[in-house]
Protein backbone atom coordinates (compact mmCIF):
# COMPACT_ATOMS: atom_id res chain seq x y z
CA UNK A 1 0.00 0.00 0.00
CA UNK A 2 0.86 3.67 -0.25
CA UNK A 3 0.63 5.92 2.78
CA UNK A 4 -0.15 9.65 2.69
CA UNK A 5 -0.59 12.18 5.42
CA UNK A 6 -4.04 13.49 4.76
CA UNK A 7 -3.34 17.19 4.24
CA UNK A 8 -2.20 16.00 0.81
CA UNK A 9 -5.78 14.84 0.06
CA UNK A 10 -7.09 18.41 -0.12
CA UNK A 11 -7.96 19.78 -3.55
CA UNK A 12 -7.19 23.35 -2.47
CA UNK A 13 -6.34 25.48 0.52
CA UNK A 14 -9.97 26.01 1.50
CA UNK A 15 -10.53 22.26 1.73
CA UNK A 16 -7.29 21.87 3.69
CA UNK A 17 -8.57 24.36 6.27
CA UNK A 18 -12.08 22.89 6.24
CA UNK A 19 -10.92 19.42 7.23
CA UNK A 20 -8.27 20.52 9.73
CA UNK A 21 -9.17 19.18 13.20
CA UNK A 22 -10.75 21.45 15.78
CA UNK A 23 -8.17 20.22 18.31
CA UNK A 24 -4.57 20.67 17.26
CA UNK A 25 -1.41 19.40 18.96
CA UNK A 26 0.40 21.97 21.05
CA UNK A 27 3.88 20.54 20.60
CA UNK A 28 6.67 21.78 22.84
CA UNK A 29 8.62 22.21 19.60
CA UNK A 30 6.24 24.32 17.52
CA UNK A 31 8.23 23.55 14.36
CA UNK A 32 6.65 20.08 14.36
CA UNK A 33 3.17 21.47 13.73
CA UNK A 34 1.92 22.30 10.21
CA UNK A 35 -0.67 24.61 11.79
CA UNK A 36 1.77 27.08 13.38
CA UNK A 37 1.64 29.60 10.53
CA UNK A 38 -1.97 28.81 9.49
CA UNK A 39 -0.71 27.44 6.15
CA UNK A 40 0.74 30.83 5.23
CA UNK A 41 3.37 29.22 3.00
CA UNK A 42 0.87 26.93 1.25
CA UNK A 43 -0.42 28.21 -2.10
CA UNK A 44 -3.99 27.84 -3.32
CA UNK A 45 -3.97 24.55 -5.22
CA UNK A 46 -2.06 21.73 -6.94
CA UNK A 47 -1.19 23.76 -10.03
CA UNK A 48 0.47 26.47 -7.97
CA UNK A 49 1.93 24.23 -5.26
CA UNK A 50 2.39 20.53 -6.13
CA UNK A 51 4.61 20.09 -3.06
CA UNK A 52 1.65 20.47 -0.66
CA UNK A 53 -1.07 18.75 -2.70
CA UNK A 54 -1.25 15.20 -4.02
CA UNK A 55 -4.92 14.69 -4.89
CA UNK A 56 -4.35 14.08 -8.64
CA UNK A 57 -1.83 11.35 -7.81
CA UNK A 58 -4.11 9.84 -5.17
CA UNK A 59 -7.05 9.79 -7.59
CA UNK A 60 -4.85 8.18 -10.24
CA UNK A 61 -3.91 5.36 -7.86
CA UNK A 62 -7.50 4.98 -6.64
CA UNK A 63 -9.02 4.82 -10.13
CA UNK A 64 -6.35 3.01 -12.14
CA UNK A 65 -5.19 0.55 -9.47
CA UNK A 66 -8.25 -0.19 -7.30
CA UNK A 67 -6.55 -3.27 -5.82
CA UNK A 68 -3.83 -1.01 -4.37
CA UNK A 69 -4.58 0.05 -0.82
CA UNK A 70 -4.17 3.69 0.18
CA UNK A 71 -3.36 4.02 3.87
CA UNK A 72 -2.90 6.92 6.25
CA UNK A 73 0.14 8.62 7.73
CA UNK A 74 -2.28 10.66 9.94
CA UNK A 75 -3.85 13.95 8.85
CA UNK A 76 -1.06 16.31 9.86
CA UNK A 77 1.98 14.02 10.12
CA UNK A 78 1.11 13.64 13.80
CA UNK A 79 3.89 12.83 16.30
CA UNK A 80 2.49 10.56 19.01
CA UNK A 81 5.50 10.70 21.34
CA UNK A 82 6.26 14.41 21.33
CA UNK A 83 5.61 16.60 24.37
CA UNK A 84 2.55 18.84 24.25
CA UNK A 85 0.17 16.62 22.29
CA UNK A 86 -2.64 14.56 23.87
CA UNK A 87 -4.79 11.53 23.16
CA UNK A 88 -7.72 13.84 22.38
CA UNK A 89 -5.58 15.73 19.85
CA UNK A 90 -4.67 12.46 18.16
CA UNK A 91 -8.31 11.37 17.98
CA UNK A 92 -9.27 14.70 16.38
CA UNK A 93 -6.44 14.32 13.86
CA UNK A 94 -7.42 10.78 12.88
CA UNK A 95 -11.09 11.79 12.66
CA UNK A 96 -10.12 14.44 10.11
CA UNK A 97 -8.02 11.92 8.19
CA UNK A 98 -10.90 9.48 7.92
CA UNK A 99 -13.34 12.25 6.95
CA UNK A 100 -11.33 13.73 4.07
CA UNK A 101 -10.47 10.24 2.79
CA UNK A 102 -14.15 9.26 2.73
CA UNK A 103 -14.93 12.44 0.82
CA UNK A 104 -12.53 11.10 -1.83
CA UNK A 105 -14.21 7.65 -1.76
CA UNK A 106 -11.30 6.06 0.09
CA UNK A 107 -11.64 3.96 3.24
CA UNK A 108 -8.65 3.89 5.56
CA UNK A 109 -7.64 0.58 7.13
CA UNK A 110 -3.86 0.89 7.66
CA UNK A 111 -1.71 3.40 9.49
CA UNK A 112 2.01 4.16 9.55
CA UNK A 113 2.88 6.37 12.52
CA UNK A 114 5.07 9.33 11.47
CA UNK A 115 8.71 8.85 12.49
CA UNK A 116 7.64 5.42 13.78
CA UNK A 117 6.37 7.14 16.94
CA UNK A 118 3.97 4.36 17.75
CA UNK A 119 2.05 4.97 21.00
CA UNK A 120 0.30 1.93 22.52
CA UNK A 121 -2.10 4.19 24.42
CA UNK A 122 -3.56 5.39 21.11
CA UNK A 123 -4.42 2.02 19.58
CA UNK A 124 -7.99 2.02 20.87
CA UNK A 125 -8.58 5.27 18.99
CA UNK A 126 -7.22 3.59 15.85
CA UNK A 127 -9.63 0.70 16.30
CA UNK A 128 -12.58 3.08 16.81
CA UNK A 129 -11.64 4.86 13.57
CA UNK A 130 -11.66 1.60 11.59
CA UNK A 131 -7.89 1.11 11.41
CA UNK A 132 -7.17 -2.63 11.16
CA UNK A 133 -3.37 -2.63 10.93
CA UNK A 134 -0.49 -0.39 11.89
CA UNK A 135 3.23 -0.59 11.36
CA UNK A 136 4.98 -1.23 14.65
CA UNK A 137 8.69 -1.23 15.33
CA UNK A 138 11.29 -3.96 15.44
CA UNK A 139 11.47 -5.79 18.77
CA UNK A 140 14.67 -4.29 20.18
CA UNK A 141 15.26 -1.65 22.85
CA UNK A 142 16.86 0.82 20.46
CA UNK A 143 13.82 0.70 18.15
CA UNK A 144 11.39 1.49 20.95
CA UNK A 145 9.26 4.50 19.94
CA UNK A 146 10.32 7.77 21.49
CA UNK A 147 10.34 11.49 20.87
CA UNK A 148 13.00 13.23 18.84
CA UNK A 149 14.36 14.67 22.08
CA UNK A 150 14.68 11.22 23.66
CA UNK A 151 16.38 9.55 20.69
CA UNK A 152 19.87 9.21 22.12
CA UNK A 153 23.12 8.95 20.20
CA UNK A 154 23.50 5.40 21.52
CA UNK A 155 20.16 4.41 19.95
CA UNK A 156 21.13 6.02 16.66
CA UNK A 157 24.42 4.13 16.58
CA UNK A 158 22.73 0.79 17.25
CA UNK A 159 20.05 1.45 14.62
CA UNK A 160 22.69 2.29 12.04
CA UNK A 161 24.84 -0.74 12.83
CA UNK A 162 21.80 -3.01 12.69
CA UNK A 163 21.30 -2.10 9.04
CA UNK A 164 24.65 -3.69 8.20
CA UNK A 165 25.28 -6.27 10.94
CA UNK A 166 22.68 -8.58 12.47
CA UNK A 167 22.22 -7.23 15.98
CA UNK A 168 18.44 -7.35 16.52
CA UNK A 169 17.76 -10.57 14.60
CA UNK A 170 16.15 -11.14 11.21
CA UNK A 171 12.94 -9.26 12.08
CA UNK A 172 10.73 -11.54 10.01
CA UNK A 173 7.45 -12.68 11.46
CA UNK A 174 4.95 -15.52 11.30
CA UNK A 175 1.45 -14.41 10.35
CA UNK A 176 0.04 -16.24 13.38
CA UNK A 177 2.17 -14.05 15.64
CA UNK A 178 0.92 -10.86 14.00
CA UNK A 179 -2.81 -11.56 13.82
CA UNK A 180 -3.70 -11.31 17.49
CA UNK A 181 -5.75 -8.20 18.26
CA UNK A 182 -7.18 -5.37 16.15
CA UNK A 183 -5.44 -3.22 15.12
CA UNK A 184 -2.82 -5.75 14.07
CA UNK A 185 0.81 -4.85 14.67
CA UNK A 186 2.66 -5.45 11.38
CA UNK A 187 6.17 -4.78 12.61
CA UNK A 188 8.76 -3.17 10.38
CA UNK A 189 11.74 -5.25 9.31
CA UNK A 190 14.44 -2.64 8.83
CA UNK A 191 15.15 0.88 7.67
CA UNK A 192 16.36 0.67 4.09
CA UNK A 193 19.22 3.12 3.79
CA UNK A 194 20.01 4.88 0.49
CA UNK A 195 22.57 3.58 -1.97
CA UNK A 196 26.09 4.91 -1.43
CA UNK A 197 27.80 5.32 -4.80
CA UNK A 198 31.17 6.63 -3.67
CA UNK A 199 33.24 5.02 -0.97
CA UNK A 200 30.39 2.87 0.23
CA UNK A 201 30.86 -0.45 -1.55
CA UNK A 202 31.68 -2.34 1.64
CA UNK A 203 28.62 -0.90 3.37
CA UNK A 204 26.47 -1.75 0.33
CA UNK A 205 27.76 -5.32 0.43
CA UNK A 206 27.02 -5.62 4.16
CA UNK A 207 23.57 -4.07 3.75
CA UNK A 208 22.54 -6.44 0.95
CA UNK A 209 23.97 -9.46 2.78
CA UNK A 210 21.96 -8.48 5.87
CA UNK A 211 18.78 -8.30 3.79
CA UNK A 212 19.34 -11.53 1.85
CA UNK A 213 20.11 -13.58 4.94
CA UNK A 214 16.78 -12.58 6.40
Residue spans for each PLM region:
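Metal-dependent polysaccharide deacetylase catalytic core of the NodB/CE4 family, i.e.
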Residues: 5-119, 176-192, 214
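Active-site-adjacent pocket scaffolds in enzyme catalytic domains
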Residues: 33-49, 112-213
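Catalytic domains of carbohydrate-active enzymes, especially glycoside hydrolases
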Residues: 1-2
Amino acid sequence: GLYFFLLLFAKDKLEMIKYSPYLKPNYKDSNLSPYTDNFKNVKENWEKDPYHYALPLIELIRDKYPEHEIGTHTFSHYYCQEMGQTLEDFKADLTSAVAIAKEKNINLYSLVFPRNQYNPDYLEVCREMGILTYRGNEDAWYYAPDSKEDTTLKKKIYRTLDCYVNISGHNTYNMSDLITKVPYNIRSSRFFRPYMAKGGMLLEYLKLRRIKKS
